[in-house]
């Protein structure tokens, strides 16, 4: 899901902070961020300021088990990467700056500790992660790809490692890994950079193994201050050893029988040790432990009792501890170069962080004086101090009298088909509410703030206490009735509700415990089971409840342990239940009999066998994060099933579309633009709601609705009558019966509307009765357009309104803000919106409320001062100053949506349902469609390649549409103003943000993320990405571009130098780039990428290419190669052409702009970069399709686009013929592909490739017309020669050339239109191409003027119909004569300079030719004897020059290029008389 569609989460946290029971802590190297992992699998990022103030910034989701350890994973200053490991073997590499998951993997072992180790190979620095845990070795893992490279193994008594430390040696190249096993044996391995550079080497055995008798070791630390001592902390004592020979230097017992849990060196002579109840002690070491002192090692060999150093300082007083569930986690960190604090950080089970700043404590302090905490904050504290409080999704409807806490939402389900969110609450009530409306109330300011109980909603009451789970079965499978909603509660009951009428249909009371889960059986179960839902309860029972029969058909109880997982075996009619103790029970569904129970390996095999039978039905009950992750990765499946019925299906559209043809073709697109997912960090927490906005789906829905909008006005009966008689398309459909049905529907909508406004709070009795009556009459119900419409509103426009209002950078441009509020109808946010960021594999980071508070106390003061007005000071600017990845996603979204709305007719969000005035203009697209709509924009508007800046063409089009009506002008004016507003919005975000925000705050978009979307499948997103990338490349100027090139050039794959040329056969090409099979890690990668559609840019898995570097199968490596090709291609194409391109292409570029390596003739410059980029692009274009590089992958399309854009730069290094043939091959069927595209929907990959290839051909032809013409002419000659020599085998290009005739003619036509001078220079070659592409029979039948009128514009081309001959004058003074019947061509020479005009006499006997350069007009006699005309013996017609006249030369009107082409023309007035007509009207008459 995150792979290629642009999906942005927005979170509504609610007032209660998520549970965060801390299990591990890390401070990043720059000292700016604390990372904490918790027992529920989330990771929290906390900002730490220089004054040691802490503010929680984001929560990272992705792990499905408790976090066991965290470690840094990168040593370079600009990147802050952290690696996390969880109890079930998952490892993730995170970018701490923005919470992106860079890489993830899952091993079959649990790590309990990870250490980062960096070494240099040559001038490259590589990182490794040394992991230890519940396995008897140390694994060495690559820090960027997370691949296991090799392991450190014990020969002598191998055992689990309990703690480990890396000792860096500055003197030698060898580093030492010291580890202590669980049994107290010290192990030493030597790691050299040579070993580390290798991959998959043999395991490395230990150098030394020595028992030091330290049981239950908690931590092992090396003294960085002296480089000589080791501190080992065990649960009952701690010891200091000499790192040279591991002899004991001193020892300390535990205080008051407490258990030590860790320790570290504070300075050369002090250690800090902490206990499991959170107390810490600082000890001063005796002189015998200090290498600098004379008495160093003086105590070696003494009995342990004699070595106790005194306590120097107790850190934390016991009295201010609060009760915690489990022991707190304590870690000591001391800063690196620029960051000198020494900090002790402690995290506990309530999500509280405590920090002590341990400066070098002066010796004079008393031993009993406790050091106070510097900072102490919990997640809940951070939530509580925010004003306004963080909002929950339905807080305004959950107010409890006399309490400031709203009712908690305990279960939720979203129904995308109706845009409704169903929330179960802790008091047992269930609320059904429009999701976008309630989110608007929580996030944005507007009139809704004045309304109590807005938006209109429905309350279902039936459970006596907390609702624990909700299920809408129709969403999972269409076999269920769409009225049914199922809920389970702590009152042991399961209730079936009718969501349309709000009544309770049935209550099941079959369980003896609270309901923990509701599931849907898979499709292929028996007919009876298919209408059941499966309920799981805390009394360890499972029930199958039939919705049809309203009874429980099977109850599987008697399980001894809680139920962990439910699996299905439909073919054998088995329900398989897995319990927490590892046992499995197999039940027969029809009879309810227990078939068998199994334990151990048998149980595992039974569960795995079920997976094979029903792969999709993996329902883990254990952990909320698992469900979230599955929901995310499988979202496309769910979305396919619950495809929201578009507004297309509503009201008038169905009636106005011509029934037979259109109705079947109305496009159904599989994604929903909004998904609401409830997540819990812990089972006891209330729901947090995440709104996922799918930008591409939203754009498609907007465009589809725009395209489907009928042209008929449906305001009142009068208008209906008028419409049926009007010339409006679609009006004629509205005859008798149709109009009656339409009325009925309009009335329904109005009734529905009025009714729902009465239903603001609780329903009246009679209202309910009436509803029941309606329900009982099935015909009546069937005629309703949309039963759940609680209030009339356009879901798509509302989603866009909510989304755009949250994304816009408010407060930077007051004029534009006014336009947004008044003209476009956007709303300002109450407070900073918490966005999220999705990354690979369903991992996501969600910003916590108040993430931007860490700017310090200034903002606080400002906010206090401005409390009287709305506190929107820092509201909007937030997201563009957070991180580069967030900026990229948000800019792409807002620009692509603004452009989409701009291309629509009057797309404003004003005209809300709040205003109930009778004259209000309806919202565009609401069912009453009361405004005459404009026709949808012409598809060429969608297809144009540049960012849509001006709204003018749109308004011009609508003006034409409205020409009949007088009242159109005000509507037109508003339409124009709205489009202008969207245009300004897009322009501001595209280019003006850096200046408005200031470069200090602005986080520029990531070039690589934009590059990956250079050819996004959604055209609007694609255009936004291209505009943003080019704007950013211009902004960073030459120095920045140079830096970008230097960064990415190393990733450019090195392809073979011989690019495939036309002579090479397909088989040779196959062998040349034979790709290794996708086996081993490659296969694994492909498996786990199931959430990436084939549209992801890495699908050109370039790792199949021979490279200089080691072959890496890491996803990130492949992605970097793809990105490097795109980025270098874009920079080369846009900024690399030294030669001034033709004026038509783009603005001229001055030579100073050329990035190093892309210039053509810059004196001896290194132009190998252009060559390598060009090789990569041509390789991607010409590489035959394979599983690794599908025929229409994104990366291939990107290569096509960039070859076209930068042809002038690449031309010297490419085989032009092969490239043009490759492009022609792709667009040979373009007409067919592009004919059946649906307005608004993304193009199919094949059509998209064809469209890109077409565009590239046009760009290449207009950039270098001679290259294009000569290459194609050469191919034509080769082809005709081959065709003549029938024995020769078919060339591989034959079919391409033949199939692409139409495409070649299209390009030639563009050239004649735009570059006539270039065409005339090569007119004979052009004519050769045209003669090849046109069907001879067609020309004979219709004549050249009709078949290809463009070429007949030239005075030096003449066609004689009766003998079917064409004469073409060439630049070098010869004339080519084509005979269409024989396909032969003959050349005559008679002039010294270019031919200005040629013309056949009316009877075809004479040909007049004129050249202005040598000022001669010649007459040629055509041999038209009977034999000649039959073409006897295939002889060429005899031609002889019978007369030549001298003519005064004609002067061109001005030195412009086109004038030279139209100097003079020849006009025959009779069979023997001809006039030479000059451009200025002078005539010369001649007679033959």
Swiss-Prot record:
Entry superkingdom? Eukaryota
- What does the entry give for GO biological process? hematopoietic progenitor cell differentiation
Region described as Disordered:
761-781, 911-947
User: SMART domains annotated for this entry?
Assistant: WD40
Map the WD repeats onto residue numbers.
17-56, 62-104, 156-199, 324-366, 404-443, 462-507, 558-597, 1349-1388, 1390-1430
- Composition-biased stretches, type Polar residues, lie in 937-947
Its keywords, alphabetically, are: Phosphoprotein, Repeat, WD repeat
- Tell me which residues bear Phosphoserine: 935, 1454
**Cellular-component GO terms for this entry:** cytoplasm; synaptic vesicle
Matching Gene3D superfamilies: YVTN repeat-like/Quinoprotein amine dehydrogenase
Residue stretches of biased makeup (Basic and acidic residues): 768-781
Note the Pfam families from the entry: WD40, WDR72_alpha-sol
PANTHER family membership: RABCONNECTIN-3B, ISOFORM A, WD REPEAT-CONTAINING PROTEIN 7
* Record protein name field: WD repeat-containing protein 7
């Amino acid at each position: 899901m995150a792979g290629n569609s642009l999906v942005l989460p927005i979170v509504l946290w609610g007032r209660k902070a998520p549970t965060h029971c801390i299990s591990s802590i890390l401070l990043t190297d720059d000292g700016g961020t604390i990372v904490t992992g918790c027992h529920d699998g989330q990771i929290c990022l906390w900002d730490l300021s220089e004054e040691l103030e802490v503010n929680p910034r984001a929560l990272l989701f992705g792990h499905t088990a408790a976090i066991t350890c965290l470690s840094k994973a990168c040593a370079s200053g600009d990147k802050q990467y952290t690696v996390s490991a969880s109890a079930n073997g998952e490892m993730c590499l995170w970018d701490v700056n923005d919470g992106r998951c860079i890489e993830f993997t899952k091993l079959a072992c649990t790590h309990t500790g990870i250490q980062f180790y960096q070494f240099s190979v040559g001038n490259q620095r590589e990182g490794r992660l040394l992991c230890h845990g519940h396995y008897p070795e140390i694994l060495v893992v690559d820090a960027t790809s997370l691949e296991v490279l090799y392991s450190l193994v014990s020969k002598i008594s191998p055992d689990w490692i309990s703690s480990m430390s890396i000792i860096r040696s500055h003197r030698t190249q060898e580093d030492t890994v010291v580890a202590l096993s669980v049994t107290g044996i010290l192990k030493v391995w030597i790691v050299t950079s040579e070993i580390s550079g290798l991959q998959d080497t043999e395991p490395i055995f230990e150098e030394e193994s020595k028992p030091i008798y330290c049981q239950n070791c908690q931590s092992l630390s090396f003294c960085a201050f002296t480089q000589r001592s080791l501190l080992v902390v065990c649960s009952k004592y701690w010891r200091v050893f000499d790192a040279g020979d591991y002899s004991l230097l001193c020892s300390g017992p535990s205080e008051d029988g407490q258990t030590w849990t860790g320790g570290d060196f504070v300075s050369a002579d002090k250690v800090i040790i902490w206990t499991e109840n959170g107390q810490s002690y600082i000890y001063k070491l005796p002189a015998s432990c200090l290498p600098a002192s004379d008495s160093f090692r003086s105590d070696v060999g003494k009995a342990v009792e004699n070595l106790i150093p005194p306590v120097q300082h107790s850190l934390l007083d016991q009295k201010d501890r609060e009760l915690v569930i489990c022991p707190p986690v304590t870690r000591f960190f001391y800063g690196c170069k620029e960051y000198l604090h020494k900090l002790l950080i402690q995290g506990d089970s309530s999500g509280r962080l405590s920090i002590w700043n341990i400066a070098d404590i002066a010796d004079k302090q008393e031993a009993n004086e406790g050091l106070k905490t510097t900072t102490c904050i919990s997640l809940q504290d951070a939530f509580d101090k925010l004003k306004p409080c963080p909002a929950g999704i339905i807080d305004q409807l959950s107010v409890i009298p006399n309490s400031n806490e709203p009712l908690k939402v305990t279960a939720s389900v979203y129904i995308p088909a109706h845009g409704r969110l169903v929330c179960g609450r802790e008091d047992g009530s269930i609320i059904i509410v429009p999701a976008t409306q309630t989110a608007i109330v929580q996030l944005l300011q507007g009139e809704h703030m004045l309304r109590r109980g807005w938006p209109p909603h429905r309350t279902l009451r039936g459970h006596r206490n907390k609702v624990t789970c909700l299920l809408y079965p129709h969403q999972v499978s269409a076999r269920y009735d769409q009225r049914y909603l199922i809920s389970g509660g702590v009152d042991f009951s399961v209730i079936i509700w009718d969501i349309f009428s709000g009544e309770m249909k049935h209550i099941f009371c079959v369980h003896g415990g609270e309901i923990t889960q509701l599931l849907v059986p898979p499709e292929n179960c028996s007919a009876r089971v298919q209408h059941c839902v499966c309920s799981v309860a805390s009394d360890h029972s499972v029930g199958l409840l039939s919705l049809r029969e309203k009874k429980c058909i099977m109850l599987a109880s008697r399980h001894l342990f809680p139920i962990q997982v439910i699996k299905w075996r439909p073919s054998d009619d088995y329900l398989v239940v897995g319990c927490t103790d590892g046992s499995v029970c197999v039940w027969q569904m029809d009879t309810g009999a227990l078939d068998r129970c199994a334990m151990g390996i048998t149980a595992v095999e039974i569960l795995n066998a079920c997976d094979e039978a029903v792969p999709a039905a993996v329902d883990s009950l254990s952990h909320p994060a698992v469900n979230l992750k599955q929901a995310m990765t499988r979202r496309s499946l769910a979305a396919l099933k619950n495809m929201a019925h578009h507004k297309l299906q509503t009201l008038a559209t169905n009636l106005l579309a011509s029934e037979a043809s259109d109705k079947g073709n109305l496009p159904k697109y599989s994604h929903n633009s909004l998904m609401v997912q409830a997540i819990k960090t812990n089972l006891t927490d209330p729901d947090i709601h995440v709104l996922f906005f799918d930008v591409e789906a939203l754009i498609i829905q907007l465009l589809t609705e725009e395209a489907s909008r009928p042209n008929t006005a449906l305001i009142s009966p009068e208008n209906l009558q008028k419409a049926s008689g009007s010339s409006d398309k679609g009006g004629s459909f509205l005859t008798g019966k149709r109009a009656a049905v339409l009325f009925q529907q309009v009335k329904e909508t109005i009734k529905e509307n009025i009714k729902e406004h009465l239903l603001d709070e609780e329903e009246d009795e009679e209202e309910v009765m009436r509803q029941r009556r309606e329900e009982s009459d099935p015909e009546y119900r069937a005629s309703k357009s949309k039963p759940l419409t609680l209030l009339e509103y356009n879901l798509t426009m509302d989603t866009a309104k909510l989304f755009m209002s949250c994304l816009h950078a408010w407060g930077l441009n007051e004029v534009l803000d006014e336009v947004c509020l008044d003209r476009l109808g956007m709303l300002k946010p109450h407070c900073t919106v918490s966005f999220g960021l999705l990354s690979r594999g369903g991992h996501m980071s969600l910003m916590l409320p108040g993430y931007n508070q860490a700017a310090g106390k200034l903002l606080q003061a400002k906010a206090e001062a401005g409390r009287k007005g709305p506190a929107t000071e820092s509201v909007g600017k937030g997201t563009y100053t957070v991180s580069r990845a967030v900026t990229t996603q948000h800019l792409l979204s807002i620009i692509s949506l603004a452009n989409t709305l701009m291309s629509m007719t009057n797309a404003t969000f004003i005209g809300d349902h709040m205003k109930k005035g009778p004259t209000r203009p309806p919202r565009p697209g609401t069912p009453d469609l009361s405004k005459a709509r404009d026709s949808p924009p012409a598809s060429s508007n969608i297809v144009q390649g540049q960012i849509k800046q001006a709204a003018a063409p749109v308004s011009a089009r609508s003006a034409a549409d409205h020409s009949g009506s007088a009242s159109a002008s005000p509507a037109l004016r508003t339409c124009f103003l709205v489009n202008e507003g969207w245009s300004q919005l897009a322009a501001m975000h595209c280019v003006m943000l850096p200046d408005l925000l200031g470069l200090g705050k602005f986080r520029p978009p990531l070039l690589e993320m934009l590059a990956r979307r250079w050819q996004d499948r959604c055209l609007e997103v694609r255009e936004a990405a291209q505009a943003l990338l080019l704007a950013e490349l211009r902004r960073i100027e030459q120095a920045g571009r140079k830096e970008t090139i230097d960064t990415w050039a190393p990733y450019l794959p090195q392809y073979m130098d011989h690019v495939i040329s036309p002579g090479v056969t397909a088989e040779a090409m196959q062998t040349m780039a034979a790709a290794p099979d996708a086996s081993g890690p490659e296969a694994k990668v492909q498996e786990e990428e199931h959430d990436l559609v084939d549209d992801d840019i890495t699908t050109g898995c370039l790792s199949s290419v021979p490279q200089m570097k080691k072959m890496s199968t890491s996803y990130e490596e492949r992605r970097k190669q793809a990105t490097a090709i795109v980025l270098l291609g874009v920079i080369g194409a846009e900024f690399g052409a030294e030669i001034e391109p033709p004026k038509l292409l783009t603005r001229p570029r001055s030579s100073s702009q050329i990035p190093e390596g892309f210039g053509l003739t810059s004196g001896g410059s290194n132009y190998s970069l252009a060559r390598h980029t060009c090789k990569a692009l041509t390789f991607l274009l010409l590489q035959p399709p394979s599983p690794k590089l599908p025929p229409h992958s994104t990366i291939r399309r990107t290569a096509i686009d960039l070859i076209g854009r930068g042809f002038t730069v690449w031309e010297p290094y490419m085989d032009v013929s092969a490239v043009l043939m490759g492009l022609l091959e792709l667009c040979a069927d373009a007409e067919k592909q592009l004919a059946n595209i649906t307005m608004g929907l993304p193009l199919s990959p094949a059509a998209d490739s064809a469209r890109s290839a077409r565009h590239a051909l046009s760009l290449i032809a207009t950039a270098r017309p001679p290259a294009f013409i000569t290459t194609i002419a050469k191919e034509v000659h080769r082809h005709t020669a081959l065709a003549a020599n029938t024995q020769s085998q078919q060339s591989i290009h034959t079919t391409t050339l033949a199939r692409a005739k139409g495409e070649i003619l299209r390009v030639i036509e563009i050239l004649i239109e735009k570059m006539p001078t270039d065409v005339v220079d090569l007119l004979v070659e052009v004519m050769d191409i045209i003669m090849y592409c046109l069907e001879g029979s067609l020309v004979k039948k219709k004549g050249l003027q009709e078949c290809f009128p463009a070429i007949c514009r030239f005075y030096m081309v003449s066609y004689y119909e009766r003998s079917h001959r064409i004469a073409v004058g060439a630049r070098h003074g010869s004339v080519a004569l084509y005979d269409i019947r024989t396909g032969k061509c003959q050349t005559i020479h008679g002039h010294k300079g270019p031919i200005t005009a040629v013309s056949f006499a009316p009877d075809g006997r004479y040909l007049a030719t004129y050249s202005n350069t040598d000022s001669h007009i010649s007459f040629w006699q055509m041999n038209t004897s009977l034999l000649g005309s039959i073409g006897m013996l295939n002889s060429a017609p005899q031609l002889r020059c019978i007369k030549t006249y001298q003519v005064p030369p004609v002067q061109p009107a001005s030195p412009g290029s086109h004038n030279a082409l139209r100097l003079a023309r020849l006009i025959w007035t009779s069979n023997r008389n001809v006039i030479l007509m000059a451009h200025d009207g002078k005539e010369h008459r001649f007679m033959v």
